[in-house]
Amino acid sequence: MPKRILQGVVVGDKNEKTVVVRVERRFAHPLLQKTVRRSKKYKAHDENNEYKIGDTVSIEECAPISKDKRWTVIAAQGK
């Protein structure tokens, strides 16, 4: 099974070797047929503490690193 890759914005970088990434998804509401935005936060591994708040990054699913971390940052898309 291939690893999932998501794109989001870094919203937290206070933890050592960890960033919090907000991933937003859009979908059509089943009743109203209006586009709805929902977001979810993922903790991702950042080995060199190189990503800062506001950076757009891609994260990839990986084996569990800690209780909450199951994602690792693979690339930055820009600010």
From Swiss-Prot:
Q: Which InterPro entries match?
A: NA-bd_OB-fold, Ribosomal_uS17, Ribosomal_uS17_bact/chlr
One GO cellular-component annotation of the UniProt record comes to: cytosolic small ribosomal subunit
Q: List the SUPFAM superfamilies.
A: Nucleic acid-binding proteins (SSF50249)
**Which Gene3D superfamilies does the annotation name?**
Nucleic acid-binding proteins
Q: Which UniProt keywords apply?
A: Ribonucleoprotein, Ribosomal protein, RNA-binding, rRNA-binding
GO molecular function, a single term = rRNA binding
Q: Name one GO biological process term.
A: translation
**Ion transport is among the record's keywords:** no
The keyword RNA-binding is annotated on this UniProt entry: yes
Recorded family membership: Belongs to the universal ribosomal protein uS17 family.
* Function (record text): One of the primary rRNA binding proteins, it binds specifically to the 5'-end of 16S ribosomal RNA.
- HAMAP family, per database record: Ribosomal_uS17_B (MF_01345_B)
Self-association state and partner proteins as the record states: Part of the 30S ribosomal subunit.
Q: What is this protein called?
A: Small ribosomal subunit protein uS17
Q: State the species of origin.
A: Rhizobium etli (strain ATCC 51251 / DSM 11541 / JCM 21823 / NBRC 15573 / CFN 42)
Give the encoding gene's name.
Answer: rpsQ
